[in-house]
Design a protein with these regions (language model features):
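Short loop-to-beta-strand junctions
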Residues: 23-29, 51-54
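Short, flexible turn/loop "capping" segments at secondary-structure junctions
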Residues: 21-23, 73-74
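Short beta->alpha transition motifs characteristic of CBS
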Residues: 16-19
């Protein structure tokens, strides 16, 4: 773990992180962080002391069949925008959060807002998809976000920002 992952030409293509092994030995399926991600993360750590990723200042909930049926959504995939931080660039771009509070497990979520279905053309079905689409984005980058609103698909351009930089950076 932590060593370089090399291709057949001896070029580093990743950093090994973990091995899944049923035998407990160093044989099995290995996982690695791509070298492009590692370079950016290391650069951010050196320059800023933290990873500097672009964010949209949203509170999201994964859409499920259960939620979609309850809320009467016409789709059963995507990420529901529960809340949008006041004063954020996402709010300025027109993305809408929900306005109907619903108890979901131990949390209150807000339904009726936009549902994010794609970012820069990449389908968004899960929170992992959402984070993957933003993985290499930095504050100041603009992304094209496809949302489902009132049974229609719309495309919004949202400029990403740094966590806590909105005019009102209180919690979402």
């Amino acid at each position: 773990s932590g060593g370089p992952l090399l291709d057949s030409q001896g070029r580093m293509i990743g950093i090994n992180t973990i091995i899944y092994s049923s035998s407990g030995t160093s044989s099995g399926v290995g996982f690695a962080v791509p070298v492009s991600t590692a370079r950016r993360v290391v650069g951010d750590l050196i320059n800023y002391g933290k990873v500097n990723r672009g964010v949209m200042m949203l509170s999201l909930v994964q859409n499920t069949s259960r939620i979609a049926n309850y809320a009467g959504y016409g789709i059963k995939n995507g990420m529901i925008v529960s809340k949008v931080r006041k004063g954020s660039l996402a709010e300025a771009a027109g993305i809408r959060g929900g306005n109907t509070p619903v108890q979901y497990g131990r949390n209150t979520i807000y339904l009726g807002g936009d549902i994010i279905t794609a970012i820069d053309g990449l389908p968004i079905a899960t929170l992992a998809d959402y984070y993957s689409a933003l993985e290499d984005k930095v504050p100041g980058d603009t992304v094209k976000v496809q949302v489902y609103r009132n049974r229609k698909y719309l495309e919004l351009e949202i400029k990403l920002e740094t966590e806590g930089t909105s005019q009102n950076s209180s919690s979402i």
